[in-house]
Amino acid sequence: MKLKPLILSNWKLNGNCLLVKKILLKLNEKLKNKNNLKVVIAPPVIYLSEFKKYVLKKNIFLAAQNVDVNLTGSFTGEISPIMLYEFGVKYVIIGHSERRLYHNESIEDVTKKFLILKKFNLIPVLCIGETKKNKDDKCIENEIVKQIDFILKKIGIEGFINTVIAYEPTWAIGKKDSASPKYIQKIHKFIRNYLSKYDNDISKKIILQYGGSVNSKNVKKIISQKDVNGVLLGRSSTNIEEFLYILDIIEKTKKS
C-alpha cells in the first residue's frame, strides 16, 4: 500500500512570530494545488495560535511537541489533550528522546500519553529507537520491541491505527550525519514486520518516519527506502529555504 509521505517539522525550543508567518506564507504557496504530501508543523505551544492564523492549505496540519496525561487540575505548565483537540491540533509527538533524557520520561509515561491521545482522537507520533550505537542487531531489536510491546499490551494492535511511528536513534539526533539509508531501511522493515505478526493489514497502513540529522543532502536516499514513509525534521526545518528544498526533494523522489 502506497502511503502519502508525511513530513513533520519539530521546531523544539526555536522560532518566533515572524518566522511562523514567513514559513506559513511560503508553505501555502508551495503546496498550492498539490495533494501528494502531508506537512505537519510542531512549533512551541505558544505559537500554535499564530500557525492556525496562517494555515490555508488542507495538507498542512498542526502538531504539539508534548501533552500531559491529566485533563484538568493543578498541574502548572502542562497542557491537556482536551485543550489541544479543541484548538485543532491533529498530531502530538510523544516519547521523543529529549523528553526521555531531560524530563526523565519512562516507557510507562509514554504509554499513558499514547492512551490518552487515542481517547481524544489525536494522532500519536510515537518516537522509538536505541540510545547507543550497537553492532549487535538483536540488542537493537530488543530495545525497540520493548518500547512497542509496552503499548501493545495495553491497547492491542488496533490502537496503532492512525498512529505514526518515528524511528529516531538517539545517537544520530543533532549530529553531523544521520544513520545510513541501508541501516534505516533495515530497522523500519523490522518494525513493520514485527507489527505485521499482530495484524498485517494494520502494519501496512502505519506511517514509519525516520528522524535524526535529516537534511537536503541525505533526505533523497532516506525517503527512497521502501519502508520509510516520511521524516521527522528538527533544526533543518526552521530554515525556510532548506525546509522547502527538502519538501521538493521528497515530492520528486516519491513521484518517480
From Swiss-Prot:
Cellular compartment(s): Cytoplasm
Active site (catalytic residues): 96, 168
GO molecular function: triose-phosphate isomerase activity
Residues engaged in binding substrate: 10-12, 174, 213
Matches recorded under SUPFAM superfamilies: Triosephosphate isomerase (TIM)
Catalytic activity as recorded in UniProt: D-glyceraldehyde 3-phosphate = dihydroxyacetone phosphate
EC annotation from Swiss-Prot or TrEMBL: 5.3.1.1
Enzyme superclass (EC): isomerase
Keyword hit for Mitochondrion: no
Record pathway: Carbohydrate biosynthesis; gluconeogenesis; Carbohydrate degradation; glycolysis; D-glyceraldehyde 3-phosphate from glycerone phosphate: step 1/1
InterPro entries assigned to the protein according to its UniProt record, in alphabetical order: Aldolase_TIM (IPR013785), TIM_sf (IPR035990), TrioseP_Isoase_bac/euk (IPR022896), Triosephosphate_isomerase (IPR000652), Triosephosphate_isomerase_AS (IPR020861)
Gene3D superfamilies the UniProt entry points to: Aldolase class I
Transmembrane segments: none
UniProt keyword annotations, A-Z: Cytoplasm, Gluconeogenesis, Glycolysis, Isomerase
GO annotation, cellular component aspect: cytosol
Record GO biological process: gluconeogenesis; glyceraldehyde-3-phosphate biosynthetic process; glycerol catabolic process; glycolytic process
Subunit text: Homodimer.
Protein family membership: Belongs to the triosephosphate isomerase family.
PANTHER family associated with the record: TRIOSEPHOSPHATE ISOMERASE
Function: Involved in the gluconeogenesis. Catalyzes stereospecifically the conversion of dihydroxyacetone phosphate (DHAP) to D-glyceraldehyde-3-phosphate (G3P).
Protein name: Triosephosphate isomerase
Species for this entry: Wigglesworthia glossinidia brevipalpis
Annotated gene: tpiA
